[in-house]
């Protein structure tokens, strides 16, 4: 692709969520969503992989449907109240339509079915953008309008997403699908605390990005797509395999790694608000999530998949280029809480 065209596309992908976050006008928020949607579609398609075209089509259809629902809600709200922003007088049906559409864009259960399939069919670097940067715009709209939304529906979406994210990742062997289900579960945690403390939603989003980015970078550096390919890293780059194992445990929320921090704070906040049943269910689902990450690490680190060749230690033959960004993010994704425990206070 032409470098100038590529630069324009990436700039537009960056610009869309910025417009949405900085706007108080619903129509401008919608324009920001469309900027990022239309710009990312060409980047999802890989000529060498026909499945990427299918993934891009699924993504476009799902996101376009959600965008139409949001636009319809905005127009109905303007017709009813004569304003481009939701207010206390806004019809509950309009607000529920908007919540459903934003849930589709975020990949929240039960509107999550497109996310694992799309993530599996696109390149790794676009999977990283899809699961991190593309989540910011819809989540920023939710944070702005959450006082008007029905908190019961929000909590139902949250617990369903946490359950589906944990349950869906159990039988997966493809790393991109595992990361997609991880994204669904993390979005559920963000949504669960939104009615009580939106600041914790932002903290959880920031930590989720810190956890997800180095994991995708590790997969890109080693061109690893499956559990089998990761298990073969032990004879090439044992240090990388160790780092991947720690990052997976952090994604699962094992203390004292970084991923434990948001889960700990969110459960504490829910208990302060007398949501004991909700907190208990979320803790149980977190254990299920941690189980499949632990099983994944056991499969890659403590057992060997059958291979056609005799694998020998090749550390002295492997030359890996140092990557400062990956090293920094990997340390942050595992050691932020142990190095700075005052974050929990």
From Swiss-Prot:
An example Gene Ontology biological process: reactive oxygen species metabolic process
Subunit record text: Core subunit of respiratory chain NADH dehydrogenase (Complex I) which is composed of 45 different subunits. Interacts with TMEM242.
Function: Core subunit of the mitochondrial membrane respiratory chain NADH dehydrogenase (Complex I) which catalyzes electron transfer from NADH through the respiratory chain, using ubiquinone as an electron acceptor. Essential for the catalytic activity and assembly of complex I.
Membrane-traversing stretches: 1-21, 25-45, 56-76, 92-114, 149-171, 178-198, 200-220, 241-261, 274-294, 324-344
Main localization category: mitochondrion
Organism: Mus musculus
Molecular-function GO terms, alphabetical: NADH dehydrogenase (ubiquinone) activity
Protein name as it appears in the record: NADH-ubiquinone oxidoreductase chain 2
Compartments it resides in: Mitochondrion inner membrane
InterPro entries xref list: Complex_I_Subunit_2, NADH_DH_su2_C, NADH_UbQ_OxRdtase_chain2, ND/Mrp_TM
Keywords: Electron transport, Membrane, Mitochondrion, Mitochondrion inner membrane, NAD, Respiratory chain, Translocase, Transmembrane, Transmembrane helix, Transport, Ubiquinone
């Amino acid at each position: 692709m032409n470098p100038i065209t590529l630069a324009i596309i990436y700039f537009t992908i960056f610009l869309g969520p910025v417009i949405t976050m900085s706007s108080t006008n619903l129509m401008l928020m919608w324009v920001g969503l469309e900027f990022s949607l239309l710009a990312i579609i060409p980047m999802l398609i890989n000529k060498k992989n026909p499945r990427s075209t299918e993934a891009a089509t699924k993504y476009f259809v799902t996101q376009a449907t959600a965008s139409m629902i949001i636009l319809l809600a905005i127009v109905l709200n303007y017709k009813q109240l004569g304003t481009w922003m939701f207010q206390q007088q806004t019809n509950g049906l309009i607000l529920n339509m908007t919540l459903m559409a934003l849930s589709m864009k975020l990949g929240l259960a039960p509107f999550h079915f497109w996310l694992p399939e799309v993530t599996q069919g696109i390149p790794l670097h676009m999977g990283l953008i899809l699961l991190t940067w593309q989540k910011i715009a819809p989540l920023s709209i939710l944070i702005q309008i959450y006082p008007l939304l029905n908190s019961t529906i929000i909590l139902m979406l949250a617990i369903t997403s946490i359950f589906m994210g944990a349950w869906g990742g159990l039988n997966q062997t493809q790393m991109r699908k595992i990361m997609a289900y991880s994204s669904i579960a993390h979005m559920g945690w963000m949504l669960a605390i939104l009615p009580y403390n939106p600041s914790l939603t932002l903290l959880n989003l920031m930590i989720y990005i810190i956890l997800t980015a180095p994991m995708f970078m590790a997969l890109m550096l080693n061109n690893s797509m499956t559990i089998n390919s990761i298990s073969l890293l032990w004879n090439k780059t044992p240090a990388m395999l160790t780092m991947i194992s720690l990052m997976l445990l952090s994604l699962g929320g094992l203390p004292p790694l970084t991923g434990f921090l948001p889960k700990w704070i969110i459960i504490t906040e829910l208990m302060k608000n007398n949501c004991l049943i909700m907190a208990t269910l979320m803790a149980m689902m977190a254990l299920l999530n941690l189980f499949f990450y632990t099983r994944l690490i056991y499969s890659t680190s403590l057992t060997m998949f059958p291979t056609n060749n005799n694998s020998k230690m090749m550390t002295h033959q492997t030359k890996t280029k140092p990557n400062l960004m990956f090293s920094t993010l990997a340390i942050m994704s595992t050691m932020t809480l142990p190095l700075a425990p005052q974050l929990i206070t």
